[in-house]
């Protein structure tokens, strides 16, 4: 009898979370409309404005080797493959803008975070576009306006 109870407990801890995750993604897709489509994106220009207004946080979801090679100097770094274990580190009161060099991985992170109840977007022009947007005087002004990147 104890084995049956133990087996049922183990089963409930493995099957129920998977079913809940599937249900959350189903709900996200069922509610998907033109407003959601527009709201899930942020350009570099929009991101920088949101950060200056203290409404958003950049989430760099690249592999740690990529981040060690080059980084923005602000935002949070959680590799995409660590996001399921670390998403609770993210603030719930800010827009989370997920970013990678282009936008393939960041769109996955955005969808995942939305199923977890976060107001998440992905960076449409990627970190390469953000680097371009922060050239020269733009970088200086951003640092002065936000106090970031000491």
Regions picked out by a protein language model, each given a short descriptive name:
Residues 3, 18-45, 50, 68-95, ...:
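Rhodanese-like catalytic fold shared by cysteine-dependent sulfurtransferases
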Residues 7-15:
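Bacterial N-terminal signal peptides
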Residues 47, 55-62, 78:
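Short hydrophobic beta-strand that contains or immediately precedes a catalytic carboxylate
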Residues 65:
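Catalytic donor nucleotide-activated moiety binding site of glycosyltransferases and closely related
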Residues 98-100:
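Short, surface-exposed ligand- or partner-binding patches at beta-edge/loop junctions that are enriched
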């Amino acid at each position: 009898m104890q084995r049956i109870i133990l087996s049922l407990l183990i089963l409930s801890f493995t099957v129920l979370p998977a079913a809940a995750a599937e249900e959350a993604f189903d709900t996200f897709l069922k509610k998907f409309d033109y407003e959601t489509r527009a709201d899930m994106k942020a350009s570099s220009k929009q991101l920088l404005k949101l950060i200056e207004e203290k409404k958003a946080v950049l989430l760099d979801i690249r592999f740690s080797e990529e981040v060690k090679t080059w980084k923005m100097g602000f935002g949070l770094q959680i590799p995409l493959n660590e996001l399921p274990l670390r998403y609770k580190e993210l603030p719930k009161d800010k827009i989370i803008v997920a970013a990678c060099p282009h936008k393939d991985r960041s769109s996955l992170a955005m969808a995942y975070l939305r199923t977890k109840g976060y107001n998440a977007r992905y960076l449409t022009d990627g970190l390469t576009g953000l680097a371009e947007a922060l050239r020269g005087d733009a970088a200086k002004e951003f640092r002065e306006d936000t106090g970031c990147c000491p």
